Amino acid sequence: GMVTSRLVDGPDGHGWTWNKDPQLGDTLHRNKGEYLHSMFSVAHDHGFRTGLYASKTKFSLFDLSWGPRYGEPDPVGEDNGRDKIDVYHMKTRSENMVDDLEKVLKKEQAFDLLMVHIRNPDTAGHGFEWNINIPSIYMAAVKKADELLEDIFDHLEEPAWKGRTFVIVTADHGGPLGLKEHGDNQNPENFTVPFYVWGPGIPAGADLYALNPESRLDPGTTNPLPSPGTLPPIRNAGAGNLCLDLLGLPPIPGSTVNAAQDLKVR
Protein backbone atom coordinates (compact mmCIF):
# COMPACT_ATOMS: atom_id res chain seq x y z
CA GLY A 1 0.00 0.00 0.00
CA MET A 2 2.76 2.48 0.82
CA VAL A 3 4.37 2.22 -2.64
CA THR A 4 1.11 2.13 -4.64
CA SER A 5 -0.95 4.45 -2.40
CA ARG A 6 -3.82 1.99 -2.57
CA LEU A 7 -5.69 0.11 0.12
CA VAL A 8 -5.73 -3.69 -0.02
CA ASP A 9 -9.35 -4.57 -0.76
CA GLY A 10 -11.98 -3.41 -3.21
CA PRO A 11 -11.91 -2.82 -6.96
CA ASP A 12 -9.23 -0.15 -6.58
CA GLY A 13 -7.17 -2.04 -3.99
CA HIS A 14 -3.81 -3.58 -4.80
CA GLY A 15 -5.18 -6.97 -3.73
CA TRP A 16 -1.93 -8.49 -2.43
CA THR A 17 -2.44 -10.38 0.85
CA TRP A 18 0.32 -12.99 0.57
CA ASN A 19 2.76 -12.36 3.44
CA LYS A 20 5.56 -14.58 2.17
CA ASP A 21 8.15 -14.56 -0.57
CA PRO A 22 6.60 -14.32 -4.04
CA GLN A 23 6.46 -17.52 -6.05
CA LEU A 24 7.99 -17.91 -9.49
CA GLY A 25 6.24 -15.53 -11.88
CA ASP A 26 4.39 -13.62 -9.16
CA THR A 27 3.94 -9.89 -9.60
CA LEU A 28 1.48 -7.38 -8.22
CA HIS A 29 0.15 -6.92 -11.76
CA ARG A 30 -0.48 -10.62 -12.32
CA ASN A 31 -2.23 -10.94 -8.96
CA LYS A 32 -4.42 -7.90 -9.63
CA GLY A 33 -5.11 -8.66 -13.28
CA GLU A 34 -3.89 -5.25 -14.41
CA TYR A 35 -0.75 -3.14 -14.29
CA LEU A 36 -0.25 -1.34 -10.97
CA HIS A 37 1.81 1.82 -10.91
CA SER A 38 3.95 2.80 -7.92
CA MET A 39 5.94 5.70 -6.56
CA PHE A 40 8.99 4.01 -8.10
CA SER A 41 7.47 3.90 -11.59
CA VAL A 42 6.31 7.53 -11.50
CA ALA A 43 9.65 8.82 -10.21
CA HIS A 44 11.72 6.71 -12.58
CA ASP A 45 9.61 7.64 -15.61
CA HIS A 46 10.37 11.29 -14.81
CA GLY A 47 14.12 10.65 -14.77
CA PHE A 48 14.60 10.31 -11.00
CA ARG A 49 16.98 7.74 -9.54
CA THR A 50 15.22 5.22 -7.29
CA GLY A 51 16.28 2.65 -4.71
CA LEU A 52 14.92 0.05 -2.30
CA TYR A 53 16.98 -1.24 0.63
CA ALA A 54 15.19 -4.03 2.47
CA SER A 55 15.81 -6.57 5.20
CA LYS A 56 13.19 -9.16 4.19
CA THR A 57 13.38 -11.37 1.13
CA LYS A 58 9.68 -10.88 0.37
CA PHE A 59 10.46 -7.35 -0.83
CA SER A 60 11.72 -9.01 -4.00
CA LEU A 61 8.06 -8.71 -5.05
CA PHE A 62 8.65 -5.03 -5.75
CA ASP A 63 11.82 -5.67 -7.73
CA LEU A 64 10.00 -8.32 -9.77
CA SER A 65 6.90 -6.20 -10.36
CA TRP A 66 8.78 -3.08 -11.43
CA GLY A 67 11.91 -4.70 -12.81
CA PRO A 68 13.11 -4.88 -16.42
CA ARG A 69 10.78 -7.76 -17.35
CA TYR A 70 7.45 -6.65 -15.90
CA GLY A 71 7.84 -2.90 -15.58
CA GLU A 72 5.80 -0.88 -18.06
CA PRO A 73 7.56 1.07 -20.84
CA ASP A 74 8.30 4.67 -19.88
CA PRO A 75 5.49 6.90 -21.23
CA VAL A 76 7.01 10.21 -20.08
CA GLY A 77 9.54 12.17 -22.14
CA GLU A 78 12.95 10.52 -22.48
CA ASP A 79 12.85 6.73 -22.25
CA ASN A 80 14.26 5.77 -18.86
CA GLY A 81 13.52 2.08 -19.31
CA ARG A 82 11.24 -0.53 -17.80
CA ASP A 83 13.33 -1.17 -14.67
CA LYS A 84 11.72 1.28 -12.25
CA ILE A 85 13.94 0.48 -9.23
CA ASP A 86 17.52 1.39 -10.10
CA VAL A 87 18.99 -0.30 -7.02
CA TYR A 88 17.39 -3.16 -5.10
CA HIS A 89 19.52 -4.25 -2.14
CA MET A 90 18.49 -6.86 0.43
CA LYS A 91 20.30 -8.08 3.54
CA THR A 92 18.43 -10.13 6.14
CA ARG A 93 20.27 -8.34 8.95
CA SER A 94 19.11 -4.74 9.11
CA GLU A 95 22.47 -3.71 10.55
CA ASN A 96 24.31 -5.02 7.49
CA MET A 97 21.79 -3.46 5.14
CA VAL A 98 22.14 -0.03 6.75
CA ASP A 99 25.93 -0.36 6.76
CA ASP A 100 25.78 -0.87 3.00
CA LEU A 101 23.40 2.05 2.62
CA GLU A 102 25.68 4.36 4.59
CA LYS A 103 28.48 3.72 2.12
CA VAL A 104 26.18 4.72 -0.73
CA LEU A 105 24.89 7.83 1.05
CA LYS A 106 28.41 9.22 1.08
CA LYS A 107 27.98 9.76 -2.65
CA GLU A 108 26.20 12.94 -3.66
CA GLN A 109 22.86 12.35 -5.40
CA ALA A 110 22.91 8.61 -4.72
CA PHE A 111 19.10 8.55 -4.91
CA ASP A 112 16.19 10.89 -5.51
CA LEU A 113 13.64 8.45 -4.05
CA LEU A 114 14.69 5.75 -1.59
CA MET A 115 12.69 3.28 0.50
CA VAL A 116 14.41 1.64 3.47
CA HIS A 117 12.87 -1.27 5.37
CA ILE A 118 14.09 -2.15 8.89
CA ARG A 119 12.69 -5.47 10.06
CA ASN A 120 13.77 -5.64 13.72
CA PRO A 121 10.59 -4.60 15.61
CA ASP A 122 8.33 -6.72 13.39
CA THR A 123 10.53 -9.80 13.69
CA ALA A 124 10.72 -9.45 17.48
CA GLY A 125 6.97 -8.87 17.83
CA HIS A 126 6.04 -11.91 15.80
CA GLY A 127 8.70 -14.08 17.37
CA PHE A 128 8.51 -13.07 21.03
CA GLU A 129 5.30 -10.96 21.39
CA TRP A 130 4.77 -7.22 21.49
CA ASN A 131 6.04 -6.31 24.94
CA ILE A 132 6.80 -2.66 25.72
CA ASN A 133 8.27 -3.43 29.12
CA ILE A 134 11.98 -2.82 29.57
CA PRO A 135 13.85 -5.09 29.29
CA SER A 136 12.15 -7.17 26.60
CA ILE A 137 13.24 -8.58 23.27
CA TYR A 138 10.73 -6.37 21.49
CA MET A 139 11.96 -3.14 23.09
CA ALA A 140 15.56 -4.14 22.38
CA ALA A 141 14.57 -4.48 18.72
CA VAL A 142 12.88 -1.07 18.77
CA LYS A 143 16.03 0.42 20.28
CA LYS A 144 18.14 -1.13 17.52
CA ALA A 145 15.80 0.23 14.84
CA ASP A 146 16.07 3.67 16.46
CA GLU A 147 19.87 3.43 16.38
CA LEU A 148 19.82 2.48 12.70
CA LEU A 149 17.58 5.45 11.93
CA GLU A 150 20.02 7.64 13.83
CA ASP A 151 22.84 6.36 11.63
CA ILE A 152 20.87 7.30 8.52
CA PHE A 153 19.96 10.73 9.88
CA ASP A 154 23.61 11.40 10.70
CA HIS A 155 24.45 10.99 7.03
CA LEU A 156 21.61 13.25 6.02
CA GLU A 157 23.29 16.04 8.00
CA GLU A 158 26.14 16.00 5.48
CA PRO A 159 26.26 18.94 3.03
CA ALA A 160 25.22 16.76 0.08
CA TRP A 161 21.87 16.00 1.72
CA LYS A 162 21.19 18.61 4.40
CA GLY A 163 18.42 21.09 3.68
CA ARG A 164 17.05 19.28 0.64
CA THR A 165 16.10 15.83 1.89
CA PHE A 166 12.74 14.69 3.26
CA VAL A 167 12.27 11.60 5.43
CA ILE A 168 9.00 9.79 6.11
CA VAL A 169 8.99 7.16 8.86
CA THR A 170 6.01 4.84 9.21
CA ALA A 171 5.09 1.19 9.74
CA ASP A 172 2.74 -1.31 8.12
CA HIS A 173 1.04 -2.35 11.38
CA GLY A 174 1.24 -2.31 15.17
CA GLY A 175 0.74 -5.22 17.53
CA PRO A 176 -1.38 -6.05 20.59
CA LEU A 177 0.48 -6.35 23.86
CA GLY A 178 1.19 -9.92 24.89
CA LEU A 179 0.42 -11.42 21.46
CA LYS A 180 2.46 -12.36 18.41
CA GLU A 181 -0.11 -11.68 15.69
CA HIS A 182 -2.06 -8.66 14.48
CA GLY A 183 -5.04 -10.11 12.62
CA ASP A 184 -7.81 -8.06 14.26
CA ASN A 185 -8.12 -4.97 12.07
CA GLN A 186 -10.51 -3.34 14.54
CA ASN A 187 -7.96 -3.36 17.36
CA PRO A 188 -6.32 0.08 17.58
CA GLU A 189 -3.11 -1.54 18.83
CA ASN A 190 -2.90 -3.16 15.38
CA PHE A 191 -3.86 -0.30 13.06
CA THR A 192 -2.32 2.66 14.92
CA VAL A 193 1.11 3.34 13.43
CA PRO A 194 3.58 6.22 13.46
CA PHE A 195 3.69 8.66 10.56
CA TYR A 196 6.54 11.13 10.94
CA VAL A 197 7.84 13.56 8.35
CA TRP A 198 11.12 15.50 8.53
CA GLY A 199 12.57 17.95 6.05
CA PRO A 200 13.14 21.56 5.03
CA GLY A 201 10.26 23.84 5.94
CA ILE A 202 8.49 21.26 8.08
CA PRO A 203 7.70 22.70 11.53
CA ALA A 204 9.21 20.74 14.39
CA GLY A 205 6.69 19.06 16.64
CA ALA A 206 3.68 19.93 14.50
CA ASP A 207 0.70 17.57 14.44
CA LEU A 208 -0.29 16.40 10.96
CA TYR A 209 -3.98 16.42 11.83
CA ALA A 210 -3.68 20.02 13.00
CA LEU A 211 -2.04 20.89 9.68
CA ASN A 212 -4.87 19.21 7.74
CA PRO A 213 -8.16 20.11 9.50
CA GLU A 214 -10.16 20.26 6.26
CA SER A 215 -8.90 17.06 4.63
CA ARG A 216 -8.07 14.55 7.40
CA LEU A 217 -9.80 13.46 10.61
CA ASP A 218 -8.17 11.69 13.54
CA PRO A 219 -10.14 8.43 13.91
CA GLY A 220 -9.22 7.91 17.54
CA THR A 221 -9.69 4.25 18.36
CA THR A 222 -11.84 3.44 15.32
CA ASN A 223 -10.72 2.09 11.95
CA PRO A 224 -13.09 3.75 9.48
CA LEU A 225 -13.71 2.39 6.00
CA PRO A 226 -13.48 4.86 3.11
CA SER A 227 -16.79 6.64 2.75
CA PRO A 228 -17.85 9.48 0.41
CA GLY A 229 -18.33 12.72 2.26
CA THR A 230 -16.33 11.55 5.28
CA LEU A 231 -12.84 12.83 5.98
CA PRO A 232 -10.30 10.00 5.98
CA PRO A 233 -7.59 9.46 8.57
CA ILE A 234 -3.93 9.82 7.71
CA ARG A 235 -2.99 6.42 6.30
CA ASN A 236 0.46 4.96 5.79
CA ALA A 237 -0.63 4.18 2.23
CA GLY A 238 -0.52 7.91 1.57
CA ALA A 239 3.27 7.85 1.85
CA GLY A 240 3.86 7.04 -1.83
CA ASN A 241 1.92 10.04 -3.11
CA LEU A 242 3.41 12.24 -0.39
CA CYS A 243 6.91 11.30 -1.54
CA LEU A 244 6.05 12.20 -5.11
CA ASP A 245 4.43 15.47 -4.01
CA LEU A 246 7.58 16.47 -2.11
CA LEU A 247 9.59 15.71 -5.26
CA GLY A 248 7.27 17.90 -7.33
CA LEU A 249 5.85 14.91 -9.22
CA PRO A 250 2.25 13.92 -10.02
CA PRO A 251 0.36 11.23 -8.08
CA ILE A 252 0.48 7.52 -8.81
CA PRO A 253 -2.00 6.61 -11.56
CA GLY A 254 -4.88 4.60 -10.13
CA SER A 255 -4.02 5.43 -6.53
CA THR A 256 -6.77 6.18 -4.02
CA VAL A 257 -4.95 7.31 -0.85
CA ASN A 258 -3.71 10.91 -0.89
CA ALA A 259 -4.41 10.79 -4.62
CA ALA A 260 -5.08 14.54 -4.60
CA GLN A 261 -1.71 15.02 -2.89
CA ASP A 262 -3.49 17.24 -0.39
CA LEU A 263 -1.75 15.96 2.75
CA LYS A 264 0.03 19.07 4.01
CA VAL A 265 3.25 18.66 5.96
CA ARG A 266 4.45 22.29 5.95
Regions found by a protein language model. Give the residues of each.
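Substrate-binding rim/cap in mid-to-C-terminal beta-strand-loop elements of soluble/periplasmic
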Residues: V3, N185-L247
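Solvent-exposed loop/turn segments at secondary-structure junctions
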Residues: V8-D9, T50, K56-L61, R119-A124, ...
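Active-site nucleophile/metal-coordination loop of metallo-enzymes that catalyze phosphate/sulfate
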Residues: G1-D45
